[in-house]
């Protein structure tokens, strides 16, 4: 065949393949949109006042009328708040990536970094960056895009090219940690829990979620006699703190594993190894035997799939350090992802049985899991498969494996993630938290409905075990609280049994690999002034909702109007996520934030409008058919002060 003819034939074949691929992806998106992106018909009457009254719905079948009430709470974790804690996170934060000569260490052939924020808001790997660095400074980092990246919501595998210079190129595992006062003291919850407990109680909440750190109780691997490896004084201190929670009139929700693996377990492989189940059960028995009469709700594992992804698949958290082969094969049936989750599921089942067999409470213990869920959607036509595959790995598998050992399913929800290629897209006209999580209250409603449909045959109730937003300005947080509570209320109206709602968190604290950058607290903390606390306006708004059980039209309107005025005035606020020239967010935090404007968009519950796919091809097709569309192109957002339009 002559060369011109061969080239022409190859070109025709390429066009046919491209057309077929486009058609297939378009069909997939059409199905996905019908199932997941249709406008929510809100069951809330927005002309009513109050808009929501949580006291109108019983949360349980208990005989005690007090137990029938929907409960509000606040949540935290040992690694975030406890001082005098020699845990894996402190070791991780104080490590340097440079050797004694100032040369950058490279412990792995490639670093697998997860771009998805996952849990507790700051659950992302630090990019080991200095604040405000220019994207041009990252030119030596070359992304190697592989299939696994899309499967795990934006894994981005990066290899370092070129030689590293010493000195200024040295970096840290945890952002916004080395540049703040007394970072290792966290919030001094160990030495002075009353500072936090008093603030929590004064909001009016009835449930306080806290944790017990495994490494504090078992600082050494129990290879011989268990007693020789246990810090019994620490166990008694935990019992005293839990008693203090109850003395403040709050019930206790106790987490047994919250993203903190003992350093000694990390050395041998942690949850990749069966013996970790045995060690964990030693820890569980210690805690249950000593404090079960003081605990009302138990969370055995917090976000297990997030911990496994970031530790064993990505090597982004302490206790992991996978090699290139482990990274590449991590999501195969025999890979480390399924392997570690398998042992964690077994540990959950054994812990569940032990708690129920040994509980000293008169009433049956309530034991569950805190499961992280994001609402994910595709940015472009060819991102649908990545979203579907990510959900297939993270949405239901772990809960499915333990659903016969659950008294409640805890939902940790922070927002939405827009997937574009190998990472997460920063959508220009969407509002985001400081840590890069898209604000989308409708997503919580969608998730609750979806989970209820899957597990309603088991009659398992739900608890919102975490929901919060990093926002130092407090302008986003106030409507964020109200709109997510309205989403929860709407789900209850639709028949979802939700026992309660816990906000993350009381005071600004250490947010995993993001350090002290993102501000999640209802209370601001002045780290340079002996950790002085100052309640933000959202603290008092949250307290008003908690004490009355109601969301009023006035509160909603005032919170929204204040945020929109800031957007109209083009005010800016801190943003702790680096973004490349294509609008994709880097996986980790910054030591110092960049500034991002508030966004003019109506993201209130039941108001958010999906604009469709935003890749160039989809936009081009939409432009062609726009003259024939009857859909309104202007969405109006109105209240008694502001009226403006968004094209």
Swiss-Prot record:
Residues 123-132 have a biased composition (Polar residues). Its main location: plastid. InterPro entries: Glyco_hydro_1, Glyco_hydro_1_AS, Glycoside_hydrolase_SF. Residues 116-140 are annotated as: Disordered. The keyword Ribosomal protein does not apply. The keyword Ligase does not apply. The active site is at 303 (proton donor), 466 (nucleophile). GO terms for molecular function: beta-D-fucosidase activity; beta-galactosidase activity; beta-glucosidase activity; galactolipid galactosyltransferase activity. GO terms for biological process: carbohydrate metabolic process. It is found in: Plastid, Chloroplast outer membrane. Pfam families: Glyco_hydro_1 (PF00232). Galactosyltransferase synthesizing digalactosyldiacylglycerol from monogalactosyldiacylglycerol in the absence of UDP-galactose. Potentially involved in freezing tolerance. This is Beta-glucosidase-like SFR2, chloroplastic. It comes from Oryza sativa subsp. japonica (Rice). The gene is SFR2.
